[in-house]
Amino acid sequence: MDAKQIAQFIDHTALTAEKTEQDIIQLCDEAITHQFWSVCINSAYIPLAKQKLAGTPVKICTVVGFPLGANLSTVKAFETTEAIKAGADEIDMVINVGWIKSNKWDAVEKDIATVLAACAGKPLKVILETCLLSKDEIVKACEICKTLNVAFVKTSTGFNRGGATKEDVALMKRTVGDIGVKASGGVRDTETAIAMINAGASRIGASAGIAIIHGLQDVSSTY
């Protein structure tokens, strides 16, 4: 797999609170230069990214209910609607982990379905925060996502105690079948990215996209 092929797996990511407008401009410039699939940014920066990426194939991905997932479902849906109005092409929502831990699976499904409806056809990725879940909980969450026919299930926010693992990616892929799997959190080098792809990931969320395609390790990156 060459650099251009790997680049098309990557959501080039900048989600930490201290990112400036100049950081977002740089992120967009890098995405254009290296032909990444998308930039993944907080929704306040969608208009800026839309301006910078106009006329390019790079998509805009944003996050909803991020990073905890404990917002009201109606709030997540409102975030989604406003993000799409602003120019978002893809939505990454955080599942309600507390509801999973409370065995409130109907509420989990309704939460995802509410956001999916607000997506109005735009691809929805559901972040499971796998480091907080048991294997059985990962499978159950993936089964719900498969039933709802979301576009992707995603491992992690990158803001918790663990990120993507090959084992979790493989488990998710076995469970969801044709639905996409996005590996995110701790994917900082070429070897790890390729391992995730081989395990079943069809998208990689990373702030170290340039290091990944150049075969270099960015040890300062956390997402």
Swiss-Prot record:
Its EC number is 4.1.2.4. The gene is deoC. This is Deoxyribose-phosphate aldolase. It is found in: Cytoplasm. Pfam families: DeoC. CDD domains: DeoC. The keyword Cell membrane does not apply. The lineage of its organism: Bacteria, Pseudomonadati, Pseudomonadota, Gammaproteobacteria, Pasteurellales. Its main location: cytoplasm.
